[in-house]
A protein has these predicted regions:
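N-terminal beta1-alpha1-beta2 module of alpha/beta enzyme domains
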Residues: 1-37, 138
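A cross-domain feature marking catalytic cores of carbohydrate-active enzymes
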Residues: 13-15, 37-41, 69-71, 144, ...
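Alpha-helix capping and helix-loop boundary segments enriched in small/acidic/polar residues
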Residues: 14-17, 44-45, 86
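Generic structural signal for helix capping and beta-alpha/helix-loop junctions
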Residues: 19, 45, 75-77
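Short hydrophobic alpha-helical runs that function as membrane-insertion/retention elements
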Residues: 34-36, 159-162
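Structural motif corresponding to the early beta-alpha repeats
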Residues: 35-49, 53
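Internal, glycine-rich beta/alpha segment that forms the wall or movable "lid"
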Residues: 51-159, 166-169
Length: 169
């Protein structure tokens, strides 16, 4: 219905709901609309899990899915999600590189060998490799509030999602 009203994009955030189910519904009920998580909180989810979801949604939609990732604040990571806290910008860089390494393995068949400070992915067998896609992997957008995340977005992502409360000051 949104597409018939002239909308060309849909964004699903993660507040009081999980963001991927609304994305699936948006992709299922549209033909051309771009649909993005805006944003999915990264650190409580394994890069492998997010890579799988991104691959499946991109394949299902013939290339209309965009992956928006964010870090959330320390209190939510530690007390809501029970995830250890570390400086978010370097960890997000590693997270995105891990997702991209997984996608590269699925696209090329190269051995998975990602080893970082926070994430290690070294096992991928044919049984767990998704079918090939006819489109490219989803673009990845990073949410950010300050220069550290903006730098990460420029270095390893496809774009930056600004916080709704951002201002020039």
């Amino acid at each position: 219905h949104a597409e018939s009203l002239g909308y060309d994009a849909l964004v699903s955030g993660e507040l009081n709901n999980e963001p991927f189910l609304p994305v699936l519904l948006g992709l299922e009920h549209s033909k051309k609309m771009i649909v993005r998580t805006g944003l999915a909180i990264a650190f409580p989810r394994s890069p492998m899990t997010v890579a799988n979801m991104g691959w499946d949604l991109q394949s299902f939609s013939d290339g209309r899915f965009q992956l928006g990732l964010g870090t959330q604040v320390k209190g939510h990571n530690e007390r809501r999600f029970s995830v250890p806290w570390s400086p978010p910008a370097p960890r997000m860089r590693e997270y995105i590189l891990a997702v991209k390494a997984i996608w590269n393995t699925w696209k090329t068949g190269e051995k998975l060998d990602f080893q970082g400070e926070h994430y290690t992915h070294t096992l991928m067998t044919p049984m767990f490799t998704p079918p090939p896609m006819d489109c490219d992997v989803p673009p990845i957008y990073v949410s950010g509030l300050g220069p550290g995340m903006a730098k990460i977005a420029g270095e390893v992502a496809d774009g930056l999602l600004l916080h709704p409360m951002c201002s020039p000051k």
